[in-house]
Curated annotation (Swiss-Prot):
It holds the Pfam family EI24. The gene is cysZ. GO terms for biological process: cysteine biosynthetic process; sulfate assimilation. InterPro entries: CysZ_sulfate_transptr, Sulfate_CysZ. This is Sulfate transporter CysZ. It comes from Escherichia coli O7:K1 (strain IAI39 / ExPEC). The keyword Aminoacyl-tRNA synthetase does not apply. High affinity, high specificity proton-dependent sulfate transporter, which mediates sulfate uptake. Provides the sulfur source for the cysteine synthesis pathway. It is a multi-pass membrane protein. It is found in: Cell inner membrane. The chain crosses the membrane at residues 31-51, 75-95, 151-171, 222-242.
């Protein structure tokens, strides 16, 4: 069945909202199950443990606030909580995406076929097994691009004043961009688009992708909703691929 999606690109907020609609479509739900289970088990357990540790971590982070900023502590404390949620949420989201990468790719492929009426290459368990080495190599490429930038931003958290004010904002912007890369990469990789070429393509619509990544990042911090965010974001990113990038980069039609 071909969807009513048009080639006219929309905002990143639109595509994120579409992800929630597309994830429950008949014929797509069975491809959602495995990514959903991985995310529920990992993110659910991780955030349960996080909330048992917040009363230790937040005072430690606030101890880096210099004396001349103590009068702002009532504002910096919420920023410290948000910082921990952002870093922690992105870290475990990355692990979940590594584990579920083959199934996320399959979900993106099947949804694209439904939205466009195109015929994808052979799929199924044997197709997934054949593609696992390529998929994991792609995940390593993303990790290698992400890690040095993340380390620089994490170091900022330990600089008095900057770590409690500027660093959370920079980390949020960085995680928004990285989550856009993470989820948009599944349909790009299904068409064997090189990682560097994919990043160049995303930069041509940077505002749209930042909007999409920002909402994904926010929902990753929200308990319960974050359990469902992985398949939702895959579906939203696939809808964006169909509207904005497929005409130029598709390998199969």
């Amino acid at each position: 069945m071909v969807s009513s999606f048009t080639s006219a690109p929309r905002s990143g907020f639109y595509y994120f909202a579409q992800g929630w609609k597309l994830v429950s479509q008949p014929g797509i739900r069975r491809f959602v199950i495995l990514p959903l289970l991985v995310n529920i088990l990992l993110m659910g357990g991780a955030f349960w443990w996080l909330f048992t540790q917040l009363d230790v971590w937040i005072p430690t982070l606030m101890s880096y606030v210099p004396d001349w900023l103590q009068w702002l502590s009532y504002l910096l404390w919420p920023l410290a909580v948000i910082s921990v949620l952002l870093v922690f949420g992105y870290f475990f989201s990355t692990i979940a995406n590594w584990i579920a990468a083959p199934f996320n790719g399959l979900l993106a492929e099947q949804l694209e076929a439904r939205l466009t009426g195109a015929t994808p290459p052979d799929t199924g368990i044997f197709g997934i097994m054949k593609d696992v080495p390529r998929i994991m190599k792609r995940e390593w490429q993303k990790f290698a691009w992400y890690l040095p930038r993340a380390i620089v931003l994490l170091i900022l958290y330990f600089i008095p004043g900057i770590g409690q004010t500027v660093a959370p904002v920079l980390w949020f912007l960085f995680s928004a961009w990285m989550l856009a890369i993470q989820y948009c990469d599944y349909p790009f990789d299904n068409h064997k688009v090189p990682f560097k070429e994919m990043r160049i393509a995303l930069r041509t619509r940077k505002i749209t992708n930042m909007q999409f990544g920002a909402l994904t990042s926010l929902f990753t911090m929200i308990p319960l909703l974050n359990l469902f965010i992985m398949p939702v974001a895959v579906c939203g990113a696939t809808a964006m691929w169909v509207d904005c990038y497929r005409d130029k980069h598709a390998m199969w039609r």
